[in-house]
Structures are given as structure tokens and as C-alpha cells.
Amino acid sequence: KQFTKCELSQVLKDMDGYGGIALP
């Protein structure tokens, strides 16, 4: 599945658990 940057940042935050990964 393709994600927009907005969706991707939310997914990464969920996976990271701390929101330590941020996309522009």
C-alpha cells in the first residue's frame, strides 16, 4: 500500500510508540 507523508508519519509514530521518528 502507498502512504502519503501524513499517513506514513502517523504509522511510524504508532510503530515507534514514542513518535521519535518524524517526517517533513
Curated annotation (Swiss-Prot):
It is found in: Secreted. Glycosylated (50% of the proteins). It comes from the Eukaryota. The keyword Zinc does not apply. The keyword Calcium applies. Keywords: Calcium, Glycoprotein, Lactose biosynthesis, Milk protein, Secreted. GO terms for cellular component: extracellular region. Mammary gland specific. Secreted in milk. One of its GO terms (biological process) is lactose biosynthetic process. Lactose synthase (LS) is a heterodimer of a catalytic component, beta1,4-galactosyltransferase (beta4Gal-T1) and a regulatory component, alpha-lactalbumin (LA). Belongs to the glycosyl hydrolase 22 family. Regulatory subunit of lactose synthase, changes the substrate specificity of galactosyltransferase in the mammary gland making glucose a good acceptor substrate for this enzyme. This enables LS to synthesize lactose, the major carbohydrate component of milk. In other tissues, galactosyltransferase transfers galactose onto the N-acetylglucosamine of the oligosaccharide chains in glycoproteins. This is Alpha-lactalbumin. It comes from Felis catus (Cat). The gene is LALBA.
